[in-house]
Regions:
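A charged, well-structured terminal subsegment
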Residues: 99-100, 146-164
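Short acidic-hydrophobic, aromatic-tinged amphipathic segments that line or gate anion-handling sites
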Residues: 80-84, 126, 141-155
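Generic N-terminal amphipathic, Lys/Arg-enriched alpha-helix
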Residues: 2-19, 28, 32-33
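Catalytic binding pocket for nucleotide-activated donors in carbohydrate/polymer assembly enzymes
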Residues: 131-145
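A positional/architectural concept
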Residues: 34-35, 39-42
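Acidic/glycine-enriched connector segments
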Residues: 21-28, 41-119, 129-135
Length: 164
């Protein structure tokens, strides 16, 4: 059986401490669930916080990197995939993830959410700002919201549960 890969997406450079804390908490829960964590793979912001927390919790981490330089990868990424496609890697991130958790927002993260909505991938915003929710709601995007990492995991389990 194929293992479940879930993505944690959020700002790299410029990520808030709150976004990184939520991502780290969530990544620990993802690892405890036995799911594989996918991030953008760099040693910055939400990507680093999530990868490091999942690794500490004994989880497997995958990083989808924009360039062709191994040194871009976080040391907490177990499987680094160099794409050489720059920001277009966001589509790989989205299509490789069964569920996308969003911790914070940036231009790159917004692009990932838009791609996920177009591809029909479940998106769960974790402690998102009202402006972010209102923006994506104005696009008629389908997504879930959670106020905590634990609530986000409950939603993800429901979304990933086999149909009866």
């Amino acid at each position: 059986m194929t293992r479940i890969i879930v993505g944690i997406m959020g700002p790299g450079d410029g990520a808030s401490a709150h976004d990184c804390d939520r991502a780290a908490q969530l990544a620990g829960l993802v690892a405890a669930e036995g799911w594989i964590l996918l991030t953008g793979g760099r040693s910055a912001g939400v990507m680093e916080a999530a990868s490091a927390a999942a690794t500490r919790a004994g989880g497997l981490t995958i990083g989808i990197l924009p360039g062709t330089d191994w040194t871009q990868a976080s040391s907490a990424v177990a499987v680094a995939i160099l794409t050489g496609v720059g920001e277009a890697r966001e589509n790989i991130n989205v299509l490789s993830s069964r569920v996308i958790f969003v911790c914070g927002i940036s231009a790159g993260t917004a692009a990932e959410v838009a791609l996920a909505c177009k591809a029909g991938r479940p998106v769960i915003f974790v402690s998102a700002a009202r402006e972010t929710i209102d923006f994506f709601r104005s696009l008629h995007a389908r997504f879930e919201t959670a106020t905590s990492p634990h609530e986000a995991m409950t939603i993800a389990r429901q979304l990933l549960a086999p149909a009866p």
